[in-house]
From Swiss-Prot:
This is Small ribosomal subunit protein bS6. Belongs to the bacterial ribosomal protein bS6 family. The gene is rpsF. It comes from the Bacteria. Disulfide bonds: none annotated. Residues 98-131 are annotated as: Disordered. It comes from Salmonella dublin (strain CT_02021853).
Length: 131
């Protein structure tokens, strides 16, 4: 089986359906003896340019190992699903399991925000104890 990276963008009005879509696509992959190495839900993000008069979309990234028949089925499903605005399937040489740069940046921002909140709370406690 080959390794693939799949990115699809969902219409922003259909964001509630994304978990069900991910579950359905994951079941199709694992049902055909495939493996999901990485699954990231990037959420709603700004588009670089408008697509069908839309400026935002819900992004999902999957790195999978699956037979060609499943990939063909997924591409057909993406094509005929009105909620999927764009999709891209790329073959990769190896399984990619580490976090993508998008998730790494998000985690770094979250850590910095948490550190800042902790420092602010510590400063407030120190100020209260001095009074």
């Amino acid at each position: 089986m080959r390794h693939y990276e799949i990115v699809f963008m969902v219409h922003p009005d259909q964001s509630e359906q994304v978990p069900c879509m991910i579950e359905r696509y994951s079941a199709a992959i694992t049902g055909a003896e495939g493996k999901i190495h990485r699954l990231e839900d990037w959420g709603r993000r700004q588009l670089a340019y408008p697509i069908n008069k839309l400026h935002k979309a819900h992004y999902v990234l999957m790195n999978v190992e699956a037979p060609q028949e499943v990939i063909d089925e997924l591409e057909t499903t993406f094509r005929f699903n009105d909620a999927v605005i764009r999709s891209m399937v790329m073959r990769t040489k190896h399984a990619v399991t580490e976090a993508s740069p998008m998730v790494k940046a998000k985690d770094e921002r979250r850590e910095r925000r948490d550190d800042f909140a902790n420092e602010t709370a510590d400063d407030a406690e120190a100020g209260d104890s001095e009074e």
